[in-house]
Swiss-Prot record:
Catalytic activity: a 5'-end diphospho-ribonucleoside in mRNA + GTP + H(+) = a 5'-end (5'-triphosphoguanosine)-ribonucleoside in mRNA + diphosphate
Species per Swiss-Prot/TrEMBL record: Rice dwarf virus (isolate Akita) (RDV)
GO biological process, one term: 7-methylguanosine mRNA capping
GO cellular component: host cell cytoplasm; virion component
Known pathway: mRNA processing; mRNA capping
Compartment(s): Virion; Host cytoplasm
Family membership: Belongs to the phytoreovirus protein P5 family.
Function: Enzyme involved in mRNA capping (Potential). Binds to GTP and might have guanylyltransferase activity. Together with the RNA-directed RNA polymerase P1 and protein P7, forms an transcriptional complex positioned near the channels situated at each of the five-fold vertices of the core.
EC number, UniProt record: 2.7.7.50
Protein name: Putative mRNA-capping enzyme P5
InterPro entries per record: P5_Phytoreov
Primary location class: virion
Length: 801
């Protein structure tokens, strides 16, 4: 091992700034994985050959010929090395669901950032199955199933996508898509948290720091009610107590927030109804049929009293089954003329909070019909037996009208072609206001002339009604409180010391505050190597100025893992969150990542990690990171597998010598399973307490830690979560009884059902000590000492005695 000639080939021959920038670029389409479950092995073999020959796709088949956990281990350990290889990867799973369930395979696929397709219930001649398989071949190396999610919402309209393309902003669109995926995952993670902590359904409310419209939609997809908290709200400029009656819709107002909304333009009521469902769990829906836009929502705990002459018992049953809501369908017209709670079964909501959605119209004398509705709703607001939270009424008045209790009069997103508005009634609405027909006509002329994006963006006026104005850093952090603070609390208007104090208090209070922020050192590294980012970025220490292609400019503070760990927070990746929440996740997936998104990291409180996440299974594993970066760099440099491990042995040898350990006390092996053998007992002084090595034991330093240190230069790397898991699993642990054993395929399990330890404390801390030398070797001295330093500092905090 001491032979000085043992240095060829090496990494310095190949790795330069261009190599590093190329790795950043590859990350945009990393994990091109599709996990495809079907019941027909011969069909899998046929299409495996087709897609491999046509597009060079790496194909794996799990067919039951090998015990399932062993098969999963071999397959996904192999895939872990291929995730940055630029080639599509397809795994066909043909074993029965009783062997490996849909839920387990979905968790595994998403843990590796893949697309998941379940068709084991389809016959061999099923048109759906054949179509999906044909698409697999024809679309390769892409696939038309999103990664890490059941649905996908891309460009709102084709003209908007065309505008982006002609203005060289298509990369930014991928950034927005992934940002929306991120927000969706954060919501799904909160839903998982609510389930695990058994939070009552009526208390499942999440506070969202910083406005972004899709949170309303994605919260209702997960059975959660959202509220926003903002430091201030721009004056809408309209009439009424909150300025929401015909608010100003000039460009300045509309472009003040994000334009992108992930809604299907064919589902015009989605914006309105998800907002209204956020205001109460008791809903009177008048003119409900067909309400297909509600079928993808999760409404467990909601009660919906639906009126429509077209309603059938089948419709009622289907709506209840799809959404989980208690649905009472009434197949008749609502009686607006009878000023009685009993007449329309509203007595069932006595002493309850109720919101009302009206989507009714008639062909004859629509003006008179609207007047009847208005009078009824004004009357209903004044009832004391029912706490009416909010009423939305379809509004197409053609005459001047006096209105009571009117809180807002807003254009209907997606409703320009039918010149439709919505009136909102509330106890705090204007007591008596005149709405002029000519004024609303002119207003709708202006609205119709706007772009579709700007029309959709007017939903922000609705969301003002579920927004609290205040300082998020002063909110109560009682146990069970859920807060999403992504792309928000890191804003430069919030001093870092206050943010860190707030997060520390949240951890101590056992609240669930999910925090997202730019990663200071990764961003600095990207700029240092000359990476061209999707957003123009300037840095002054940890103050970052962003300017994106849509014209927005803002400033954030960057944060590091070590300072957040000091505050009681642990980094977790979006991939880990979506895999961990896969049993409840009902959000969107994505197709392409962006370098901009990889500059951010997300953190959760340490109390939750210690309670729920110390037992590592594939959902919480960094398996999608630990092999692919080192394998890519090693292959680029043609460094043999054996040589790579011998290099690691040399680095350990140098470190031990630097600590005055006599070389006769150990024997360097430098293999994949053994770094060195301890010949005689010795100890190494360390800030976490002495590292103790007993005679006649083998030491295998943590390759995961070293690989994560390389990955951390390019993408979010959950080093501290992994270190917490290693500390907990430094001894054998029994398999948890409530989890499928297949999720632990990457672990070694003893005959008694215990998970064998991953590494000793010494093996982890020794790896941390050579981490910078290792990164310097792998990246030819073009590594970031700051990234390595903060990781090492945080790991030492985890293991400090």
């Amino acid at each position: 091992m001491s032979n000085p000639d043992y240095c060829i080939p090496n990494f310095s021959q190949t790795v330069n700034e261009r190599t590093i920038i190329d790795i950043f670029t590859i990350c945009r389409y990393r994990s091109p994985l599709v996990v495809f479950c079907l019941s027909h092995n011969e069909l899998a073999k046929k299409y495996a050959q087709d897609v491999s020959m046509s597009s060079g796709t790496h194909v794996h088949i799990i067919d039951g010929s090998v015990e399932i956990t062993a098969s999963l281990y071999r397959t996904f350990r192999t895939i872990a090395t291929q995730l940055l290889g630029r080639m599509q990867i397809v795994v066909f799973v043909t074993v029965d669901k009783s062997v490996v369930s849909t839920q387990v395979m979905k968790s595994i696929a998403w843990a590796f950032r893949g697309s998941f397709v379940e068709l084991r219930n389809q016959s061999v001649d099923s048109s759906t199955l054949v179509s999906k398989l044909e698409n697999l071949v024809s679309f390769a190396p892409l696939y038309n199933v999103p990664k890490c999610g059941p649905d996908y919402y891309g460009p709102t309209v084709y003209s908007e996508l065309l505008s982006l393309a002609t203005n060289a902003r298509t990369h930014w669109y991928a950034t927005i898509d992934y940002s929306m995926f991120t927000r969706s995952v954060l919501t799904g993670f909160i839903a998982k948290y609510f389930n695990e902590e058994a939070v009552p359904i009526d208390k499942r409310i999440v506070s969202i720091v910083g406005y972004n419209p899709p949170y309303v939609w994605t919260c209702l997809r997960h059975g959660i009610r959202p509220t926003y908290i903002e430091k201030s709200l721009p004056n809408p400029g309209g009439k009424g107590p909150f300025g929401l009656i015909l608010p100003v819709i000039n460009e300045l107002v509309l472009k003040s927030k994000v334009k992108y909304v992930m809604h299907n333009p064919q589902i015009k009521l989605l914006c309105l109804d998800t907002f209204m469902l956020s205001t109460s769990m008791n809903i009177l829906y008048i003119g409900a049929y067909p309400a297909t836009h509600l079928l993808s929502l999760q409404l467990n705990g909601w009660t919906i009293l639906a009126f429509d002459p077209k309603i059938t018992s089948d419709w009622t049953d289907a709506m209840a089954k799809a959404t989980g809501a208690k649905v009472i369908g009434v197949n008749k017209e609502f009686d607006f003329k009878s000023f009685s709670v009993q007449a329309n079964q509203l007595n069932m909501f006595q002493n309850s909070k109720l919101s009302v959605i009206d989507d009714t119209w008639v062909e004859t004398d629509y003006e008179k019909f609207q007047a009847e509705k208005q009078a009824y709703f004004e009357w209903l607001i004044d009832r004391t037996s029912i706490d009416v939270r909010l009423i939305s009424m379809k509004w197409n008045r053609s005459k001047d009208t006096s209105v009571s209790h009117l809180l807002a009069l807003l254009p209907q997103p997606y409703g320009a072609s039918i010149r439709e508005m919505r009136a909102f009634f509330h106890k705090k609405g204007a007591s008596d206001i005149k709405i002029l027909a000519a004024e609303t006509e002119k207003y709708m002329d202006d609205f119709t002339a706007m772009s579709v994006s700007d029309q959709i963006n007017t939903q922000k006026f609705m969301h003002c009604m579920i927004t609290t104005v205040g300082d998020a850093l002063k909110m109560d952090l009682d146990g069970g409180r859920a807060v999403i603070a992504s792309y928000s609390l890191s804003n430069s208007s919030n001093p870092k010391e206050r943010v860190l104090k707030f997060l520390s208090d949240a951890n101590k209070a056992k609240a669930m505050v999910v925090f997202g922020a730019p990663n200071t050192h990764r961003l600095a590294y990207a700029k240092k190597v000359g990476l061209v980012l999707d957003s123009a970025i300037k840095m002054s220490k940890d103050l970052i100025t962003f300017s994106n292609p849509t014209g927005r400019r803002w400033r954030d503070y960057g944060y590091s893992q070590s300072e957040l760990y000091d505050a009681g927070y642990v980094e977790i990746t979006i991939d880990q969150m979506v895999a961990y929440s896969s049993d409840v996740y009902n959000g969107v997936g994505y197709f392409a990542n962006s370098t901009y998104n990889d500059l951010f990291s997300w953190y959760i409180p340490k109390w939750y990690v210690h309670k729920r996440m110390l037992m590592q299974d594939i959902r919480l594993s960094p398996a999608a990171l630990v092999k692919c970066f080192t394998t890519l760099i090693r292959n680029i440099c043609y460094v043999p597998h054996e040589t790579y491990y011998r290099f690691r042995g040399i680095l350990v040898d140098k470190y031990l010598r630097s600590k005055n350990v006599d070389p006769s006390q150990y024997s360097i092996v430098g293999s994949g399973s053994k770094t060195f053998t301890v010949l005689n007992h010795f100890e190494v002084p360390h800030e976490c307490g002495p590292l103790v090595f007993e005679a006649s034991t083998d030491v295998n330093i943590s390759g995961h830690l070293l690989s994560l240190a390389i990955a951390a230069h390019f993408v979010a790397s959950p080093m501290i979560l992994w270190a917490e898991q290693m500390k907990y699993m430094a001894v054998d642990r029994m398999l948890p009884p409530n989890l499928d054993k297949s999720l632990f395929f990457d672990n070694k399990v003893t005959p008694s059902g215990a998970l064998q330890r991953w590494h000793s404390r010494e093996e982890v801390l020794l790896a941390a000590e050579i981490c910078e030398s290792y990164a310097a070797m792998m990246l030819n001295n073009k590594h970031s000492p700051d990234i390595i330093g903060t990781l090492k500092s945080a790991i030492n905090l985890v293991f400090k005695i």
